[in-house]
Amino acid sequence: MRRHLSLVLGSLVIGLALLIAPGASWAYPFWAQQNYDSPREATGKIVCANCHIAKKLTQAEVPQSVLPDSVFTASVKVPYEEGIKEIGADGSEVQLQVGAVVMLPDGFTLAPQDRWTDEIKEETEGVYFTQYSDEQPNILLVGPIPGDQNQEIVFPVLSPDPATDSNIHFGKYQIHVGGNRGRGQVYPTGEKSNNTVFTAPAEGKVASIDAGDNGASVVTIQAADGTSTSETIPVGPQLLVNVGDSVAAGDAITNDPNVGGFGQVDAEIVLQNPVRIYGLLAFFAAVAIAQIMLVLKKRQIEKVQAAEGNF
């Protein structure tokens, strides 16, 4: 019941947002939160890719190792060509929005703000972080936010301490990262957005191109047997066909207006036991002392040999 209520309220919020700002370039993580218990499927695919079909590069930078109960940053880069714009929901050109999801290992969470350094505060200015769910504080989301200012998104992370949580162990862990720029090509309902290419539903000739609702175009294709099939093209994509053109099923009848895309990448991080570090430092110190002693002993022997040679 609670899940359905959240879905209804969320849908109302999105509907109002689209009415108020129809030209915005939305990339809602809301859909993933409402439709999937986890943002990562058993196959390893992050579910954002179900709507953001186009693939683009995403990069992640994390420390090689961290100590328990320490604050570090995970950086997600969602690069794209500066100045580029995309088609908004109303067909107008809008700035790209970006977003990111970081799936941290269990126990790792968003660092509390009172432990952020001045550098972290500067890097995260204007960025709002949310948890995927109350039960999954290790999965962090950002977006949509303006892409022209945030092609690199920095996540402040707090590492767990095995000394205070018996479920946490020292060792190597994986971090799963997803980054997106721009709107999706498919809605969660399965319908195409106006940010994708439209194809001919059947083979035949374009019989008519009529004006539809809200600036859409209705392309009617008549097959050789006389049957007709229509495809509604929303405002945004540009038609590539004219009345009388012959098309095959699956042929593109519009351009592809999409300029964005989604990408995912995995990274590794080691939760390091400080005792091992101290032991390693002690080992290095012992080796250094042993080498110094060997050098001193060698010089002592050389002096003795030199003294014996004088007699």
Swiss-Prot record:
InterPro entries, per database record: Cyt-f_TM, Cyt_f, Cyt_f_lg_dom, Cyt_f_lg_dom_sf, Rudment_hybrid_motif
Signal peptide: 1-27
GO terms for MF: electron transfer activity; heme binding; iron ion binding
TM spans (from-to): 277-297
Domain of life: Bacteria
Names of the cofactor(s): heme
Record protein name field: Cytochrome f
Naturally occurring in which organism (per UniProt): Synechococcus sp. (strain CC9902)
